[in-house]
Amino acid sequence: MTINRLTISALAVAAATGWAAPAAAQDNAAVAEELAQMRAQMAAMASRIDTLESQLQVAKAEAQAATTAAGAATASAAAATEAAKKPAETAIAWKGAPEFTTASGWSFKPRGRLQVDAGTVSSPAGITDNGLGFGSEVRRAYLGFDGKIPGGFGYRAEIDIANSGVEITDLYLTYQASKSLGLTIGQHKAFWGLEELTSDLFLSMTERAAVNTAFGYERRLGVSGTYSAGDVIVQGGVFTDNVADLNDDGNNALSLDGRVVFAPKVGNGQLHLGGSLHWRDLNDSAASVRYRVRPFLHTPDVRFIDTGNISAVSELGYGLEAGYVQGPFHATGETHWQKVSRPGALVDPTFFGGYAEVGMFLTKGDTRAYKGGTFDRIKPKNPVGKGGMGAVQVNLRYDYLDLIDGGFVGGTQNGYDIGLVWTPIEYIRFMLNYGHIEYDNAFLPAAGGDRSYSVDAVGARAQFDF
């Protein structure tokens, strides 16, 4: 359309100037040439306009695409931000082993421990036992898992495979009824006392004090509750027996166990005061009990003091416990009385034991951890691998046990123990112990029938857990 108008205008101009007259014939060729040039210029202009229009369309299309992409990016960023606000479906944390936790409240964590012991116990003159002298063993090899279930529930299942077999240790379900009240059903520890309830991972010596091993403390099947309010902890439960012993359908034992703890902060220190009470009905017509203890270490299967079997219908135990932690220093001690009720008019003996212990960290900034009425995991201030040497602790313990009463002469012991504990990182420990034990009226006679003698024991342990 634009070219046609220009052509008509050009013809009109030519006619007005006399382009059609015969006198101007000589100029026709020049005019025609000019018109041709004008047409070429107009065609070029039209082509340029078409090109610009095409480029404009392309630019519009690109702008639209950019706007669409920007909108998509904005939407994607908003979605990512919203997703970031929501917890991951499954989170993984590391606490010695991976712990898997879901947004719905489930969690699962494998757990285990390995304790390898070696040691030697001297042999009094005249006593020959292959268990004395040097020995070594895998003291514990636990494998299991624990976790949480939505609704305030929790669980733990664990076995010990150290002794060429499988022994169930913990196997229970928990319920946190409120912030203060927790319930447990299944196989777990009754509430004996401070050292017994403290995990063997966190002990001061390789073995617990004699009073905590002589009277048959063990995990039992039962139902229990723990109430905590401020500085006070109240624990109680009803138990039968260890699940392995319940394979005997004649085992009808039933016990009631309770413990109260008062644990206030005193200045810069943590105080622990407690007491426990235990009553157990054996519920068997031919029932008996036996109290005895190894010489400081677990490697020898020999007991220098031993009551032998005592016919019994029930047991009554009661104990006191105390502890204090301030900075690198700790002190703790327990006493326990165990009374045996015998059938008919037989005399009811009462046996007694206790220990007193002090300890000190030699490394700066380290302290014995305390939590929920028991001693807890030591976390070195300067662990190996982070520029430090870990935590080093020295412990001293006096250990007493009296198994003589009511006509039963099982012997007495006075033990003097020293231990060195090195914790390079919180999940690994190395322990070295020495114990000197003096026996009177011992169960095993030495040369010439002598029942008053002493033994020395040295033990070491390497352990890790996860």
List where the protein language model places each region.
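N-terminal periplasmic/intermembrane-space "pro-region" immediately following the signal or transit peptide
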Residues: A25-Q115, L362, D366-K379, F466
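Outer membrane beta-barrel
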Residues: K95-N283, T350-K386, Q393-G406
